[in-house]
UniProtKB/Swiss-Prot annotation:
Disulfide bonding pattern of the chain: C49-C100, C149-C198
Protein family membership: Belongs to the immunoglobulin superfamily.
Signal peptide start-end: 1-21
UniProt membrane topology term: Single-pass type I membrane protein
Domain Ig-like C2-type: 42-107, 142-205
Transmembrane segments: 246-264
Keywords noted in UniProt: Cell membrane, Disulfide bond, Glycoprotein, Immunoglobulin domain, Membrane, Receptor, Repeat, Signal, Transmembrane, Transmembrane helix
Protein name as annotated: Killer cell immunoglobulin-like receptor 2DS3
The UniProt record lists the keyword Membrane: yes
Length: 304
């Protein structure tokens, strides 16, 4: 049994050595923007590509271009590999959709799956719109709220951002009313407040936005019966996705070997137990017969 367990353990070890790097090699890295993906004109932005796979190089590419691919050697810190790409002071020709890739030492010309796309937007190019709330900036809990973004400029699209959230909502501008173009953003029943801003843009330059509207603080008063967190609000019950991915992957790999080891131990213990019972069988029978004989003698004495 011992030789079999050792053999299976060796097979499993070499299988893991061959399979684990390939799985990690296929896993896509993550791409972040610092200080954020909405960048004012002439402001510096850094794009960070990172992964829990130990990539040797990272590549950064902007969609629609062929000569803008950047390549950096990855830094390995605390089980994470990363590279920081500085794209300089923000200009209109630097705005767009970016993705990054990773490569490992033994396959320098083969790349991982691409990261999720990251849209880098330049702001501050046009006149700022106005942002207002209906029925007002202070509402009762559960009361419906609509934010209206409007401008004298003929923007095709309006974008609404919430402080602390990564993504924006967008709506097409409606017909011109009283000399202004407007888009309404229904927020539904109010459960929590927040600070909002809006921007305007044109169809032919979707990554070039206007200046930000003045911030609008929406306050909610009262205690709603059912208050739900924002979809982007982190839950205390939700762990780090990277750590969960590694934990689940390791558990799946270990499970077959654990089952096999349990089966072999169970079989070995069963064989040992059966052998022990067979050795003790005759002695057990003799003991039972002796007790029966004593009982019969006792009964004979009682009735004599």
């Amino acid at each position: 049994m011992s030789l079999m367990v050792i053999s299976m353990a060796c097979v499993g070890f070499f299988w893991l050595q061959g399979a684990w790097p390939h799985e990690g090699f296929r896993r896509k890295p993550s791409l972040l923007a610092h200080p954020g993906r909405l960048v004012k004109s002439e402001e510096t932005v850094i794009l960070q590509c990172w992964s829990d796979v130990m990539f040797e190089h990272f590549l950064l590419h902007r969609e629609g271009t062929f000569n803008d691919t950047l390549r950096l050697i990855g830094e390995h810190i605390d089980g994470v590999s990363k590279a920081n790409f500085s794209i300089g002071r923000m200009r209109q020709d630097l705005a767009g959709t970016y993705r990054c890739y990773g490569s490992v030492p033994h396959s320098p010309y083969q790349f991982s799956a691409p990261s999720d796309p990251l849209d880098i937007v330049i702001t501050g190019l046009y006149e700022k719109p106005s942002l207002s709330a209906q029925p007002g900036p202070t509402v009762l809990a559960g009361e419906s709220v609509t934010l209206s973004c409007s401008s004298w400029s003929s923007y095709d699209m309006y974008h609404l951002s919430t402080e602390g959230e990564a993504h924006e909502r967008r709506f097409s501008a409606g017909p011109k009313v009283n000399g202004t173009f407007q888009a309404d953003f229904p927020l539904g029943p109010a459960t929590q407040g927040g600070t909002y801003r809006c921007f305007g843009s044109f169809h032919d330059s979707p990554y070039e936005w206007s200046k930000s509207s003045d911030p609008l603080l929406v306050s909610v008063t009262g205690n709603p019966s059912n208050s739900w967190p924002s979809p982007t609000e982190p839950s205390s019950k939700t762990g780090n996705p990277r750590h969960l991915h590694v934990l689940i992957g390791t558990s799946v790999v270990k499970l077959p070997f654990t089952i096999l080891l349990f089966f072999l131990l169970h079989r070995w213990c069963s064989d040992k137990k059966n052998a022990s019972v067979m050795d003790q069988g005759p002695a057990g029978n003799r003991t039972v017969n002796r007790e029966d004989s004593d009982e019969q003698d006792h009964q004979e004495v009682s009735y004599a």
